[in-house]
Amino acid sequence: MKIHYRVKKNTIEIIRCYGTDSRVVLPEEINGLPVVSAAPYAFSAHKDGEEDAETWESEEAFSFGEERLLAGEEVQEIVFPDTLKEIGRYIFYGCKKLERLEFSDTLMQVGTGAFTGCSGLKELVIHQKK
């Protein structure tokens, strides 16, 4: 999996994800910095343009096929790390096939309209931070 991100105050904000699997598991750290937020529209196919970003690639990633943007109808499950504190507005906008989300009780802020168009969401797992 490939992740586009930006550094904000010595923390990481996820901007976009690319891969071959419809299941996204985000890391707790990138280059030694904690992943604490996911940008507005990060998993939405409706996002206009791309922002300046750095790229991180999973070391254990070995995939068959061409990587694609994991957004909109391309994503079915997202597992956020225990370090995540905030998800941006309209982050899942139009993710009709998104069925499962997992995050911990450290998530403190959910942006406006985050679940707009998530008609297939069946399971929301919230666990206590380890």
What are the roles of these predicted feature ranges?
Residues Y41-A42, G88-I91, G111-T116:
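Consensus positions within tandem repeat domains that build extended binding/scaffold surfaces
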Residues M1-N10, Y18-V36, D48-E86, K96-Q109, ...:
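Structural signature of tandem-repeat unit edges
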